[in-house]
Amino acid sequence: MKKLLPCTALVMCAGMACAQAEERNDWHFNIGAMYEIENVEGYGEDMDGLAEPSVYFNAANGPWRIALAYYQEGPVDYSAGKRGTWFDRPELEVHYQFLENDDFSFGLTGGFRNYGYHYVDEPGKDTANMQRWKIAPDWDVKLTDDLRFNGWLSMYKFANDLNTTGYADTRVETETGLQYTFNETVALRVNYYLERGFNMDDSRNNGEFSTQEIRAYLPLTLGNHSVTPYTRIGLDRWSNWDWQDDIEREGHDFNRVGLFYGYDFQNGLSVSLEYAFEWQDHDEGDSDKFHYAGVGVNYSF
């Protein structure tokens, strides 16, 4: 599953590594690993919840950054030592920073991701192999000494085995907003988030969905410690993932609160922990309670 804040300190370390590499115009690297879990209370199909291990490697030189990652996701029954339908996801991204200064920054990312699905106890399904292409500009604009406007916009194209995986062939995703820095310790970010899956092919209607949220973060920096309480407030959400049985859209209302903690050892090593709870209401069926937790480690050199 996709999460915008998981292990933010690790992402920050990667960004710092890129900035340092640009200043020195030499190579800088970082490697890391994460283990994430997701669970909907009382939902038997996800067994004990989704397990999501991942590893990554980034290399930066001047305005260039190359990122490699490998991720898995699937339901796990820990007591029985088995898992349900799962997929693995190798990924390559290349980012180029066209402009970077205190007043304005602009970069562009291109990426390729492969989804390898392995179906368990699903009649008529064995494996599926789907690809995703990505292009994503990002920006940061200084409005005042304390106020900045920043964000990113990703455009995706999916191909192969879409009728099996249930994905739409096109997707856009963006998160953008304002950040106000009160002092070296406290800042506030308020963003608008949109993710929309749709089909450019008029003959298809599978996997279409829309999510709109307000996302607010309160980053606190206390020496080597970073703490970020955050929330996601649902504005509009619908899906038709079960298009084979019911082509009508189903409405949802999801609202989340979470807390991220990171620690930088000041020797290249950093670690992070995160937990989030989400209330999920649906037009069809009962409401759900969702839990997310993640732990990560990163080393920069």
Curated annotation (Swiss-Prot):
Gene3D superfamilies: monomeric porin ompg (2.40.160.40)
Main location: membrane
Protein localization: Cell outer membrane
GO process terms (BP): carbohydrate transmembrane transport; monoatomic ion transport
Segments crossing the lipid bilayer: 27-35, 47-57, 64-72, 89-98, 104-112, 129-136, 149-158, 172-182, 186-195, 201-209, 213-222, 230-238, 240-248, 254-265, 269-279, 289-300
InterPro entries given in the database record: Bact_OM_Channel_sf (IPR053713), Outer_membrane_porin_G (IPR018981)
Topological type in the membrane: Multi-pass membrane protein
CC terms in the record's Gene Ontology section: cell outer membrane; pore complex
Signal peptide residues on this chain, from the entry's feature table: 1-21
Keywords attached to this entry: Cell outer membrane, Ion transport, Membrane, Porin, Signal, Transmembrane, Transmembrane beta strand, Transport
Superkingdom in the source lineage: Bacteria
One of the record's GO molecular function terms: oligosaccharide transporting porin activity
One Pfam family this sequence matches: Porin_OmpG
Subunit structure: Monomer.
Function: Forms channels functionally larger than those of classical porins. May act as a regulator of the RCS-phosphorelay signal transduction pathway.
UniProt name for this protein: Outer membrane porin G
